[in-house]
A protein has these predicted regions:
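Activation corresponds to long, low-complexity, non-globular regions
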Residues: 100-181
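Accessory beta-strand-rich segments of carbohydrate-active enzymes
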Residues: 1-128
Length: 181
């Protein structure tokens, strides 16, 4: 089996072999920026390619969210908590004999990049998405070695059930459109 334990500085989405993992949106949610971050654990065995010699791609898209974007700070001033987004993940593999192996995100085996169709994403300012972006922005030749982020010194705690989910049954449908002059 395979479990992926994750957290981030900023809002993130997870993908395994191109498949979105998890139903929550705005992960890891809003917490005290200096004291706690929430972690999420996913069973990802079904998303893995298990053929001999197969390559599995674990990808994460991280945007500033409440971490590195405009917010109102605890002092009441507009500011940012951190300056750079970050991600931490650990993959736990359990083999047929019960033994386990752990593979963690790091600056030697993982790749990172800032290219892609999402040019800016913020909690209050929305998202800027460039649909003209050509495929291949997430290929290894476009990515580089990630930087280590040491801005957060708080505690990482498991998710406590206060997540946000997209609910299609609550989506609004336009009834009429008009031009306002």
């Amino acid at each position: 089996s395979a479990r992926w334990m994750t957290t981030g500085l900023g809002v993130y989405e997870l993908y395994v072999n191109g498949k979105l993992i998890g139903e929550e949106i705005l992960k890891p949610g809003f917490t005290h920026p200096y004291k706690t971050k929430r972690s999420f654990t996913y069973e990802v065995s079904n998303a893995l390619s298990k053929q001999a010699g197969a390559e599995n791609v674990f990808a994460v898209q991280v945007t500033p969210g409440w971490w590195a974007d405009k917010i109102i700070t605890y002092s009441g001033q507009q500011g940012m908590v951190g300056t750079k987004v970050a991600f931490r993940g650990v993959l736990e593999l359990t083999y047929a004999d019960g033994s386990k192996a752990y593979l963690g995100s790091n600056t030697s085996d993982w790749k990172a990049g800032i290219a892609g169709p999402v040019k800016h994403a913020a909690i209050f300012d929305g998202e800027e998405y460039d649909a003209r972006e050509l495929p291949g922005y997430d290929t290894l030749d476009k990515l580089s070695t990630p930087e280590k982020n040491t801005e957060f010194e708080g505690e990482i705690l498991p998710s406590n059930g206060g997540e946000v989910y997209f609910r299609e049954d609550l989506a609004l449908s336009p009834q009429k459109a008009y031009l306002w002059k």
